[in-house]
Amino acid sequence: KGLDPSVWVAEDSILALPDIRNIYTKDIAPNLETDMPVIVTGDFNSCSHLDWTERAKPLHHGYGPVAFPASRYMLENGFKDSFREKNPDEVAYQGGTVAAIYGQMQMSRIDFIYYKGGLKVLSSKIVRTAPEIDYVWASDHAAVLTVFEVE
């Protein structure tokens, strides 16, 4: 049951999606009334449908495509995923961020930088720990680093 993508999507719909909808309504939407760029970052506790594609099935133990609702919600509201914009090949650039210090699930991205309006992505990468400091890293997540140019 835990390896059933329909369960993942259902859980995402119950847990991650309501959180992002609430944040969107209270904190993001009011800032969209101007022409200023908006950047939304963080641990979404949800994977991306842009990563779990038909092409990437072999990387995800044969599962995919998976339509994770939280990532779809952001794109449906006009935001772009900065990492996937700059690294569109989800097979060559998996960009895993979760459990980074343990070497597990490194193909799963749950940390994102979404943006819209007046920005151009110059670069975007995942920053992992150096092997010699694996157990000193402040988080079990890798960092997402995106450099933008304001247009």
Model-derived regions: residue spans:
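Active-site regions of metal-assisted phosphoester/phosphodiester hydrolases
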Residues: 1-151
